[in-house]
Amino acid sequence: MKAFIHTDWWDVLKPEFEKPYYHQLHEFLKNEYRTKNIHPDMYNIFQAFEWTPFADTKVVILGQDPYHGPGQAHGLSFSVLPGVAVPPSLVNIYKELQDDVGCTPVNHGYLESWAKQGVLLLNSVLTVQNGVAFSHAGKGWERLTDVAIQRLSERSTPVVFILWGKAARSKIKLIDTQTNVVLQAPHPSPLSAYRGFFGSKPFSKTNIALTSFGEQPINWQLPEHVNLEH
């Protein structure tokens, strides 16, 4: 099988790509991309694994499925491409970021700089039909991303897992909480942010944990201007 993830995640996940469930998912996706408008672009499906290698992952921010509007999703949870309006959940993340660690909000939602510092921005489902949230749930992606979470949890170097909302928090069963740090809060969506997301201080808590592991803290301040890599 020719590698289609070009980092050490390939070795971690390759056994999954050889299993029947993934072959079924692959056939489903081929038909979906051929006949419908699917996000993200097929070349960006595994972008989170490309930008944040397994050995470099220090933090995981878990999402559900990609944004389902045109031109938003590019393979990272919560992140959108430059030139697209910042989605409401990310607006609230920026509010908490400013309140927690004093970061100045930016007018884009492109979280590449976090990913390149070791923040794995992982959705549990990696594709979605345009305009239809959760349309690719239950097709097999969850099995693959659950394995990614488990392998990180088992790693000798600990990881900070940030779980926002009920769906993300259900993944705690995959994580060894004795050796890793888990930060839980309500989802940053406008529907739930006031129930405890605001004031949860995930960014400062993450950096305290990383420092205790002997790791470099994350610089959460996003650049004011971003350029797409080609």
From Swiss-Prot:
Superkingdom in the source lineage: Bacteria
Enzymatic class: hydrolase
Entry EC number(s): 3.2.2.27
Family indicated by similarity: Belongs to the uracil-DNA glycosylase (UDG) superfamily. UNG family.
Span of the signal peptide: none
Keyword check for Ubl conjugation: no
Protein name as it appears in the record: Uracil-DNA glycosylase
A Pfam family assignment: UDG
Molecular-function GO terms, alphabetical: uracil DNA N-glycosylase activity
Gene Ontology process terms (BP): base-excision repair, AP site formation via deaminated base removal
Active site: D65
Swiss-Prot/TrEMBL keywords: Cytoplasm, DNA damage, DNA repair, Hydrolase
Source species taxonomy: Bacteria, Bacillati, Bacillota, Bacilli, Lactobacillales
